[in-house]
Amino acid sequence: MVKIKSNLKQLKLSVPAQESPISSFLTASGTFHDGDFLLNQKGLRLTSDEKQSRQSDSKELDFEITAEDLETVKVIGKGSGGVVQLVRHKWVGKFFAMKVIQMNIQEEIRKQIVQELKINQASSQCPHVVVCYHSFYHNGAFSLVLEYMDRGSLADVIRQVKTILEPYLAVVCKQVLLGLVYLHNERHVIHRDIKPSNLLVNHKGEVKISDFGVSASLASSMGQRDTFVGTYNYMSPERISGSTYDYSSDIWSLGMSVLECAIGRFPYLESEDQQNPPSFYELLAAIVENPPPTAPSDQFSPEFCSFVSACIQKDPPARASSLDLLSHPFIKKFEDKDIDLGILVGTLEPPVNYLR
């Protein structure tokens, strides 16, 4: 059972501010306008962009995408911000994942969606970040046309295989770390919601970071944040306790995600907790007050145990950076082994087949 040393005394929970109606963000022509952000049926434009470029041409595609070109196959995901649909281009036959967000939602969520669009606009050139091909605003909804990752997420993978072996985990970690190096060092972005369900996989064995709805852009790579957003299970202790945090909070979340994939359960839960899980506050208190989880040394290699410990440190400065972790012995151990993650995920049933 989860044991807690003391009560969690610090937790920043903010009272929602008075919200502005969606109509206050719309121009006379129906364009959604929020600061430097403009979005309509034709696409996205950031007025702060030096080139003033409009996202009317679909990225990395030799054909254009409009709302009329896409037909819905089925809903493949739901969340607080909207739904994700599997859609097909009527004329080309290519599949995409389209996130549709109705804008009659809380203003805080609306701001997160705007943030996601801005980050996707800048980050789609990284091969380890899910590509956002196009986005538009129409009939009160934002739509993001995203790369379709046909094997779902790491959460879908472990749902079928229960645990992932070290060689495959090394391949997963390297790809996620390359994505984090790009986000942290080039885009100055803290993802803030790294977890198995936000690490997507395709049949080729490519792993990509998705869902930037709660990401935070920083002015420099030395910046810090002090807001409480993201999925609490994978939050670092400093974020839960309301302290400032930086890129190292993503490293904690990565370590938690990788360890979960290895042992087949959330690291702070023992086997008996699966049937009677702790409450929200008990789990938060355990993450802040208890020693961090470790990989069992009798089940895993010293390299893997060391990698997990390099990520899951209570003291943020003690965590390795994404760049340092790329040269960790666990990553290097399998680099010349020609490990093909596609072999593992290729044997699995695509999640779209069992989602209703």
Swiss-Prot record:
Q: Which GO terms describe its biological process?
A: defense response to oomycetes; lateral root formation; male meiosis cytokinesis
Tissue expression profile of the protein: Expressed in roots, stems and flower buds. Higher levels in shoot apices and flowers.
**What is known about regulation of its activity?**
Activated through serine and threonine phosphorylation.
User: What general EC class does the enzyme of this chain belong to?
Assistant: transferase
Q: Which Gene3D superfamilies match?
A: Phosphorylase Kinase, domain 1, Transferase(Phosphotransferase) domain 1
Q: Which CDD domains match?
A: PKc_MAPKK_plant_like (cd06623)
An annotated GO cellular component = cytoskeleton
Question: Could you say which residues form the signal peptide?
Answer: none
- EC number(s) in its UniProt entry? 2.7.12.2
Cellular location of this protein? Cytoplasm, Cytoskeleton, Phragmoplast
**For the modification Phosphothreonine, which residues carry it?**
231
The terms under GO molecular function for this entry are: ATP binding; MAP kinase kinase activity; mitogen-activated protein kinase binding; mitogen-activated protein kinase kinase kinase binding; protein serine kinase activity; protein serine/threonine kinase activity; protein tyrosine kinase activity
Q: Which SMART domains match?
A: S_TKc
Main location class: cytoplasm
Cited InterPro entries: Kinase-like_dom_sf, Prot_kinase_dom, Protein_kinase_ATP_BS, Ser/Thr_kinase_AS
User: Positions modified as Phosphoserine?
Assistant: 221
Q: Which domain of life is it from?
A: Eukaryota
Question: What keywords were assigned to this record?
Answer: ATP-binding, Cytoplasm, Cytoskeleton, Kinase, Nucleotide-binding, Phosphoprotein, Serine/threonine-protein kinase, Transferase
Reaction(s) catalysed (UniProt annotation) = L-seryl-[protein] + ATP = O-phospho-L-seryl-[protein] + ADP + H(+); L-threonyl-[protein] + ATP = O-phospho-L-threonyl-[protein] + ADP + H(+); L-tyrosyl-[protein] + ATP = O-phospho-L-tyrosyl-[protein] + ADP + H(+)
Q: What happens when the gene is disrupted?
A: Plants exhibit a dwarf phenotype with fewer flowers, large cells with multiple nuclei in various organs and large malformed pollen grains. Defects in the formation of the cell plate. RNAi MKK6 displays fewer lateral roots.
Q: Please report the stretch or stretches of sequence annotated as the Protein kinase domain.
A: 70-331
What is the annotated role of this protein in its UniProt record? Answer: The ANPs-MKK6-MPK4 module is involved in the regulation of plant cytokinesis during meiosis and mitosis. MKK6-MPK13 module positively regulates lateral root formation. Phosphorylates and activates MPK4. Activates MPK5 and MPK13 in vitro.
Family named by the database record: Belongs to the protein kinase superfamily. STE Ser/Thr protein kinase family. MAP kinase kinase subfamily.
Q: How does it assemble?
A: Interacts with P.syringae type III effector HopF2. Interacts with MPK4, MPK6, MPK11 and MPK13. Interacts with ANP3.
What name appears for this protein in its UniProt entry? Mitogen-activated protein kinase kinase 6
* Gene name of the record: MKK6
